[in-house]
Design a protein with these regions (language model features):
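Bilayer-spanning, highly hydrophobic alpha-helical transmembrane segments
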Residues: 13-17, 225-256, 268-289, 570-599
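Membrane-cytosol interface motif
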Residues: 62-67, 107-123, 296-322
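Actuator/coupling domain of P-type ATPases
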Residues: 22-30, 35-118, 122, 134-141, ...
Length: 621
């Protein structure tokens, strides 16, 4: 408990003891009333002050005003005990609500407790702790075992395992060594690391994430906006209704020649006010969304606002950019077909001829061969745009490229039966075979598609710039419903616009990309999801939902968290309104007394807040 919460608890206990003491005492009359005022002011002075300030500001219609009018009115009618009890129980509910909200905020703070307190800089042979915001780009910082990396950078010295769970939600440590990039917010588990910073603290990963989480409450869901507007209309409406309930029936009775019974009707009106307090809704709905966003962040899913969390539950179509989302974006040798030599020799000719090239295919060929390239053995290399390259390896003329290069050299290559990227090789003018490469499908990609179907997604679509055969093979392997290939970035935007027109009423479209090359499409979709955004400023800026690692299965998890959060929100709305409606009717016709009003108000608030805190664990299912 905070200091303020402890103070409020003491006030409640002291007031409750005094109320019971006066209740059981033999005192009656004005002396009893004066004694009841002592616990009343101890427990309720802050509510009365807020109500008075609200009146002077012209913002009188809130829960403080309702409680002040109800309790003062009850005591004015001689119901001293009831007036005190209403204030005590209301403050018990407020304390419980404050504790629940604080606990949820602390839970999220713990989950997102990634802001470093200091950075170590070597000075005069000793380590000096400085504020991370004072560290300039290019400074070498030292991170000891157990410390959090304060700023993004590159390891210059040392080797260690780092825990990235605060960013990605994954518990498996990552090994880093000299030359590797490291991100702020990760914890060094072993070994001393010297890191040269590549960004200022304000531009580092940890600062970007913290800013995103802190500002997520600014973008409200429709359910939250509904409650805000509802409370703005509802509170004045019940106040005017209470006035009407206190005045109209007695006036009607007077006109009809009966006793007006002012006391009875004013008591009913005051009971009506206590029951009508909208605290349960006003508090529990934002708390539910806050908890849902926190639960998602614990799993490495950053949602930029409760409006996007709500939208995820309504997603009917998910469109994927293939490379980097469903596939790793790394070429891998799938098959070889050598002619007159073994596969290793064929790979050797191709890899050595490609030794100077930085193209991803060249890197894949060198990796598949696994041998040590001696550049002194490679001469006369000439890259031919749109064809491939030629060169000499140990004096032998080697050509590596596509079918057009072979035909240009007068060689008729053999076509592979399998779809993929084909590299043909010729040595000394003789066809030597082909090497088939393909983008590697991510381990959990097929599971991710199945998970989306299980969450109610009606259609999955894959967009790619790859050739049609290769694209259809990947789509078939993963179970994607539709695929569009050989697309330029502008074509992808047009495809998404077409799909937006075709979607079913009330269903939304989500686009999943890497967040770097797909910014126009991410912006055009109803929900832009950037995947593998760890360390990518562009991804965090462009998307509505950011997945901090490369696991596509987390898209379905995000939808599951969204659905559970919304279920909790709707449970609270229906429960609170139903109980309030019944009790308001009972209060208006005189069946519900002040004690039932207290129970209805505090009980509904406590149960709604308890239910709302379940949203924090939504990602743990």
């Amino acid at each position: 408990m905070s200091k303020k919460q402890k103070t409020n608890l003491i006030r409640i206990i002291v007031s409750a003891v005094l109320v019971i003491g006066v209740w059981v005492s033999p005192l009656t009359g004005w002396l009893e009333g004066v004694l009841y005022l002592i616990p009343y002011f101890i427990v309720g002075y802050d509510i009365l002050l807020k109500a008075v300030k609200g009146i002077f500001r012209g913002q009188m219609f809130d829960e403080n005003f309702l409680m002040a009018v109800a309790t003062v009115g009850a005591m004015a009618l001689g119901d001293w005990r009831e007036g005190c009890a209403v204030m005590v129980f209301y403050q018990i509910g407020e304390l419980f609500q404050s504790y629940a909200v604080g606990k949820s905020r602390r839970s999220i703070s713990d989950l997102m407790d990634i802001r470093p307190d200091y950075a170590n800089i070597e000075s005069g042979g000793a380590l000096e702790k400085v504020d991370p915001e004072d560290v300039a780009v290019g400074t070498v910082i030292v991170v000891q075992p157990g410390e959090r990396i304060p700023i993004d950078g590159v390891v210059t010295e040392g080797e260690a395992a780092v825990n990235t769970s605060a960013l990605t939600g994954e518990s498996l440590p990552r090994q880093v060594k000299a030359g590797d990039e490291v991100l702020s917010g990760c914890v060094n588990l072993s070994g001393l690391l010297h890191i040269r910073t590549t960004k200022e603290f304000g531009d580092s990963t940890v600062a970007k994430i913290l800013d995103l989480v802190e500002n997520s409450s600014m973008k409200k869901a429709k359910a939250e906006n509904f409650i805000t507007k509802f409370a703005r209309i509802y509170t004045p409406a019940v106040c005017y209704s209470a006035v009407a309930l206190a005045v109209l029936p007695p006036v009607v009775r007077l006109i009809m020649g009966n006793a007006p019974m002012w006391g009875d009707w004013i008591t009913r009106a005051l009971t009506f006010l206590v029951i009508s307090c909208p605290c349960a809704l006003v508090i529990s709905i934002p708390l539910s969304f806050f908890g849902g966003i926190g639960g998602a962040s614990a799993k490495g899913i950053l949602v930029k606002g409760s409006n996007y969390l709500e939208a995820l539950a309504k997603t009917g179509c998910v469109v994927f950019d293939k490379t980097g989302t469903l596939t790793k974006g790394v070429f891998q040798v799938l098959e070889t077909a050598p002619e007159g030599m073994d596969a290793q020799t064929l790979l050797g000719w191709a890899a050595q001829a490609e030794c100077y090239s930085k193209h991803p295919i060249s890197q894949s060929l060198k990796s598949a061969w696994g041998g040590q390239v001696d550049t002194d053995r490679v001469t006369d290399v000439e890259e031919l745009g749109g064809f491939g390259l030629t060169g000499r390896v140990d004096g032998h003329a080697v050509a590596v490229g596509n079918r057009r290069l072979m035909e240009k050299l007068g060689i008729q290559p053999i076509e592979p039966q399998r779809a993929g990227t084909v590299v043909y090789v010729a040595v000394d003018g003789v066809y030597a075979g082909w090497i088939l490469l393909g983008d590697v499908v991510k381990e959990h990609a097929a599971q991710a598609i199945r998970g989306l179907k299980a969450e109610g997604v009606e259609k999955t679509v894959m967009l790619t710039g790859d050739a049609n055969a290769a694209a259809r093979q990947v789509a078939s392997q993963l179970g994607v419903d539709d695929v569009h290939s050989q697309l330029l970035p502008a074509d992808k935007v047009r495809q998404v616009e077409r799909l937006l027109k075709e979607r079913r009423e009330g269903r939304l479209l989500a686009f999943v990309g890497d967040g770097i090359n797909d910014a126009p499409v991410l912006a055009r979709a109803d929900i832009g999801i950037a995947m593998g955004a760890l360390g990518s400023d562009a991804a965090i800026e462009a998307a509505d939902v950011v997945l901090m690692d490369d696991d596509p299965a987390k898209i379905a998890l995000a939808m599951r968290i969204s659905r559970r959060t919304l279920r909790i929100v709707y449970e609270n709305i229906v429960f609170a309104l139903a109980v309030k409606a019944v009790c308001l009717v009972l209060g208006a016709i005189g069946i519900a007394n002040m004690w039932l009003a207290i129970g209805a108000d505090v009980g509904v608030m406590v149960l709604a807040v308890l239910n709302a805190t379940r949203a924090l664990s939504a990602g743990k299912e």
